[in-house]
Amino acid sequence: MGKIIGIDLGTTNSCVSVMEGGNPVVIPNAEGSRTTPSVVAFKEDGERLVGQVAKRQAITNPDKTIISIKRHMGTDYRVNVDGKDYSPEEISAMILQKLKADAEAYLGETVTEAVITVPAYFNDSERQATKNAGKIAGLDVKRIINEPTAASLAYGLDKMDKSHKIFVYDLGGGTFDVSILELGDGVFEVKATNGNTKLGGDDFDQKIMDYIAETFKAENGIDLRNDKMALQRLKEAAEKAKIELSSSTKTNINLPFITADATGPKHIDMDLTRAKFEELSADLVQATIEPMKKALADAELTINDIDKVVLVGGSTRIPAVQEAVQKFTGKEPSKGVNPDEVVAMGAAVQAGVLTGEVKDILLLDVTPLTLGIETMGGVATPLIERNTTIPTRKSQIFSTAADNQTSVDIHIVQGERKMAGDNKTLGRFQLSGIAPAPRGIPQIEVSFDIDANGILNVSAKDKGTGKEANITITASTNLSDDEIDKAVKEAEKFAAEDEKRKESVEVKNNADSALYQTEKALKDLGDKVEEADKKNVEEKLEALRQVKDGEDLEAIKKATTELTEEFYKVSSKLYQQAGAEAQQGAQGTQGADMGGNAQGKDDDNVVDADFKVEDDK
């Protein structure tokens, strides 16, 4: 069985991990970093960039650079690039392809399976969209796992010998979750979860961006938010300032030539203090308090029952966030995990559980939101309450609302509001063929089945006729099977094009290298190369120069090989000549030595004769 990788598909950064020797290991990307920016860009020539290289060129290419796509998962949002619409699943798939390729390079084998994390508060359509993104990227998503749960898996892997309750506060780039788990005897049981899928580090950046833009507008009368390139520079500066204010109390924001008007170029040079930043973002920090209270209440615990507090997500490095969590829990958060990597590591642990590499761990997760159907009067009738352990199956008997009704429409909703219209619609389907009868007589059994990924299947059965209908929830905002298949083919085409571009670069680099090395060697050898040989090599050099900048890779390869082979003949010939000359020289020296030795031997004989001692007679 091949390796199953663990992926944290984040709003601003993503990370991939794998189990090695019983422990999760973060896989560095091709650029050497342990996390990859969740950024996709398209160049003018159609080339696709993902990760750090995409983020680097965002200022000069703002229209074709896509960031924070995770915030649109499970919606009908589309990104238009060069006249083509891309769904959030397709853009996310490009990020997943990059992570998959980095993992394959690290492991030296093909990777086809993954465990992918999602915010605990992701609804059904957002989870399904994540799974679809994996499929488009060529990954069989074996499990969708909640981010705080994954973090607790990584945190608790070496702490399974004792029972304790963990409070996980997860503030990422675009989403916020809080989960309370109980760990004991290898069982990770989620007691409750709460959160906000529209709150994260991006919002803290936005506060700084707005502050800079408003200050600049007040001084210069120009709103930089109307200039895409200036806006991208503002975003980068805001993110940098936020990070610096985590370790220092003041930072300088310097953006020369940010714009210009009739009076000339305009610059930004201003200081931002941590105190001002905390004032600007106080409402965001405050917005995380209520979900913490709700999670505790749903878990039927008090803060005194909590043993450990774990911070997850890069935004938890913000001092005001840490202070808020510490004040609420009364406990110092654990510093033993890297907030940027722990979720991916937990996903790798879950992958290890699936492959059997990690034993004696049982993960009991929950569904974050109440699931139900619309009943008479537009009421939302719950079948599965929020924080129910999954996988689970619940059934309930309903009946008709009118006499002689032969069909019923099943409207599935997700949320905590009392009226169906105020909750999120997950799907609709119809059960027909019901035997005519007075209202309230037919018995229709509606069953909700949630799998371990948190994805819902709904069925309805008329107990009188045995007629049955069912639906696996795929919201209208998600891609259809045909659209997914089409996206898979396009992703494969993109991958093939990327591979072709890579091959083109390598072939042309080899050609340039062969030209340079041969020209240099010819120059260094000078007159040692015979004119005929030099002419042959120069012909091959010229032949390669003629084709090296074209797109016919086979012609470039052929010309490179012919040049290399021709020069090899010349160098072999020179080597043989040098060897022959050296051998002749050695023979001449040896002859001279032998003559000297013969003379020396005669001399020795004379000396021996002179000093010959004879016995006395």
UniProtKB/Swiss-Prot annotation:
Keywords: ATP-binding, Chaperone, Nucleotide-binding, Phosphoprotein, Stress response. Residues 578-592 have a biased composition (Low complexity). The modification Phosphothreonine is found at T175. Residues 600-617 have a biased composition (Basic and acidic residues). Residues 578-617 are annotated as: Disordered. Gene3D superfamilies: 1.20.1270.10, 3.30.420.40, Actin, Chain A, domain 4 (3.90.640.10), Substrate Binding Domain Of DNAk, Chain A, domain 1 (2.60.34.10). Induction: By stress conditions e.g. heat shock. GO terms for molecular function: ATP binding; ATP-dependent protein folding chaperone; unfolded protein binding. Transmembrane segments: none annotated. Belongs to the heat shock protein 70 family. Acts as a chaperone. This is Chaperone protein DnaK. The lineage of its organism: Bacteria, Bacillati, Bacillota, Clostridia, Eubacteriales.
